[in-house]
UniProtKB/Swiss-Prot annotation:
Belongs to the MRE11/RAD32 family. It is found in: Nucleus; Chromosome, Telomere; Chromosome. This is Double-strand break repair protein rad32. Its EC number is 3.1.-.-. It comes from Schizosaccharomyces pombe (strain 972 / ATCC 24843) (Fission yeast). Changing residue 248 to R: Decreased repair of double strand breaks (DSBs). Core component of the MRN complex, which plays a central role in double-strand break (DSB) repair, DNA recombination, maintenance of telomere integrity and meiosis. The MRN complex is involved in the repair of DNA double-strand breaks (DSBs) via homologous recombination (HR), an error-free mechanism which primarily occurs during S and G2 phases. The complex (1) mediates the end resection of damaged DNA, which generates proper single-stranded DNA, a key initial steps in HR, and is (2) required for the recruitment of other repair factors and efficient activation of ATM and ATR upon DNA damage. Mn(2+) 2 binds at residues 65, 133, 222, 250. Signal peptide: none annotated.
């Protein structure tokens, strides 16, 4: 179980504790055109970064959805860049030592992958983030808005997923004192696809071989946490048990206290969003960020309530349970009087909530709470008269922030048990059907009765969503070209002649509907255990170079003939000091001199291999550190991307 490092003396705490501010889903740019709520996302995002600067953290870790729009406006980009520059740049030296080559996780190698190592800018607090479902890559070049933040040197964008059906998760290795951090990230992948990828053992997690029991393994994901449907979420049982901590993005409900998974033996923390993007129950909990203090393998989470978040109160009202309103033909006046009184109570409660969030911070004289968000969900089943929701809401213009949708009237529906899910997901599925009719759903409904011959329905549906919701004008064109190229390559590979060309094309077309409509019954039951995936060690074992203290410890897999070398230390150009950068105190720059005992069962690396890895002009002797999957004994079987394709239901 995690321990509280607050009992440690200050010197040990400073030298060996990695302090990480964790947050998720700031949705910068949400509602920016709203006359009342337009600046809410900018203010809350800036508050998070200010907390990081004031609390003197070592780094910031975000769980995705920095931006609300896939193509953020100039205003949203400006506000995000401004907050990052004001709070994360400075001459304070970063005490984190990078031990791995990050080219596998952070993309473009032409620019410095980790911003605090760049000699051209002074980064005091590095920001690490994965992308979410709102700011995911799209369009020509598959760029994300986070790529813009990275190329400016303000954010370290990691956890990219170039291939959905072959995901390799490589960590960023950081060290401070004797504390070693392996930072993993999986950016957002469509939930059904990621679910199937895990079930088919197409997700690989690479681990450091040396000192493997000393690494604190932290994973960041951006997926559905709760099971809305059988496959549209990421079960915790799919995540390997070598992790110590999981930062869960995408879900907006703030569960900052976290929960311990006794089966997988890791702690899951869901920070939630920093702004309410919908008037739903999950957004009502007070918004928090947290500071994760890691010392060795122990950690302690300090939660911090956000002060600038607009208060939000939601109340559920069932009129049939209100004794003062008898069901009769003429009861509209009584209903409206009762609902108005409930809105007044909610406004008073919201103001008290805002003052509570200020804590010990003194409130500026004459400062008033921001206009609150109020939502009444009213069940008027049983013959009750109501008023037009917008007309009712307009009574509170100037008193609430959402003066057009304060109330939501609905009639209670009888839920039927689904044979497929046996009633487990009925409520959630019904809510989805009522509240969120997506373009993708319309496309799928249309294609049920109008089958396509050459294009897979799911891919076309996803392309339509990207075209409509993410303004990706080339999405449909790219989808069509990609699928046609696959079929052409398949015909070429089969060496089809002109005589049987039409027959082969018809065969391919006839096979596509069978593949796309195949019911994956084997996916409906969760596995008892999902172990680390089976991979071919010879093909998937990149090498890291490490300091001479690791020279006496070698992996038995070091003789692999197809290792890929990764520089663990920055290039000499990145080690140059700038005029503004201050040197670290000598007490903070001492290396960990503990030498591990050599295991008797470990095979030595051949002399030839050692000589190749130690021929460096650098003063420090280098050795090798391997990533590998310890449970792997057989090579995983993969589908040929050009020949076969398993499509989602």
């Amino acid at each position: 179980m995690p321990n509280d490092p607050s009992d440690m003396n200050n010197e040990l705490h400073n030298e060996n504790t990695i302090r990480i501010l964790i947050s998720s889903d700031p949705h910068v740019g949400y509602g920016e055109k709203d006359p009342v709520r337009g600046n809410d996302s900018f203010v809350s995002f800036n508050e998070i970064l200010e907390i990081a600067r004031e609390r003197d953290v070592d780094m910031i870790l975000l769980g995705g959805d920095i931006f609300h729009d896939n193509k953020p406006s100039r205003k949203a980009l400006y506000q995000a860049l401004r907050s990052l520059r004001l709070n994360c740049l400075g001459d304070k030296p970063c005490e984190l030592e990078l031990l791995s080559d990050t080219s596998l996780t952070t993309g473009d190698t032409a620019v410095c992958n980790i911003n605090y190592l760049d000699p051209n800018i002074n980064v005091a607090i590095p920001v690490f983030s994965i992308h979410g479902n709102h700011d995911d890559p799209s369009g020509d070049g598959r760029y994300s808005a986070l790529d813009i933040l990275q190329v400016t040197g303000l954010v370290n964008y990691f956890g990219r997923v170039p291939e959905n059906d072959n995901i390799v998760v490589s960590p960023i290795l950081l060290q401070k004192g004797f504390t070693k951090l392996a930072l993993y990230g999986i950016s957002n992948v469509r939930d059904e696809r990621l679910y199937h990828s895990f079930r088919e053992n197409k997700v690989k997690f690479l681990r450091p071989d040396l000192y493997r029991d000393e690494w604190f393994n932290l994973l960041t994901v951006h997926q559905n946490h709760s099971a809305h449907t059988p496959t549209s979420y990421l079960p915790e049982s799919f995540i390997q048990d070598f992790y110590d901590f999981v930062l869960w993005g995408h879900e907006h409900e703030c569960l900052i206290d976290g929960s311990y998974n006794p089966t997988q033996k890791f702690t899951v923390v869901q920070p939630g969003s920093t702004i309410a993007t919908s008037l739903s129950p999950g957004e009502t909990a007070p918004k928090h960020c947290g500071i994760l203090n890691i010392t060795g393998k122990d950690f302690h989470l300090e939660k911090i309530r956000l002060r600038t978040v607009r208060p939000f109160i939601m109340k559920d009202i069932i009129l049939s349970e209100v004794s003062s309103i008898p069901p009769m033909v003429e009861n509209k006046k009584e209903v409206l009087t009762y609902l108005i009184s409930k809105v007044e109570e909610a406004i008073t409660e919201a103001n008290a909530q805002w003052y509570e969030a200020q804590g010990t911070v003194p409130v500026v004289e004459n400062e008033k709470p921001p206009l609150p968000l109020i939502r009444l969900r009213v069940d008027y089943t049983g013959g009750y008269q109501t008023e037009n929701p917008q007309r009712f809401s307009n009574r509170f213009v100037g008193r609430v922030a959402n003066a057009t949708d304060v109330v939501q009237f609905y009639l209670k529906k009888k839920y039927t048990r689904s044979k497929r899910n046996d009633g487990l997901y009925t409520s959630a599925v019904e809510d989805i059907k009522i509240n969120s009719l997506r373009v993708e759903s319309l496309v799928n409904e249309y294609l049920k009765t109008n089958r396509l011959e050459c294009l897979p329905e799911d891919s076309l549906g996803e392309a339509v969503v990207n075209f409509v919701e993410k303004d990706d004008r080339d999405a449909i064109k790219e989808c069509v070209e990609t699928q046609l190229n696959k079929q052409i390559n398949l015909l070429v590979k089969k060496r089809v002649t002109e005589e049987n060309l039409e027959q082969e094309i018809s065969s391919i077309i006839n096979d596509l509907p069978k593949i796309s409509t195949t019911k994956r019954k084997d996916y409906e039951e969760l596995p008892e255990e999902v172990s680390e995936t089976s991979i071919n060690i010879a093909e998937h074992t990149p090498v890291l170079k490490h300091t001479s203290s690791l020279l006496d410890h070698h992996s038995p897999l070091a003789t692999s003939s197809s290792e890929h070398e990764m520089e663990a230390t920055p290039s000499p150009a990145l080690l140059k000091k700038t005029n503004k950068r201050r040197e670290l105190p000598s007490s903070l720059t001492k290396k960990n001199t503990r030498t591990p005992q050599r295991s008797k069962e470990v095979k030595k690396v051949p002399a030839r291999k050692l000589s190749q890895s130690t021929k460096k002009s650098d003063k420090n002797t280098q050795s090798t550190l391997l990533f590998y999957d310890p449970s792997s004994t057989t090579e995983a079987q993969y589908l040929d991307n050009e020949d076969d394709e398993i499509l989602d239901d």
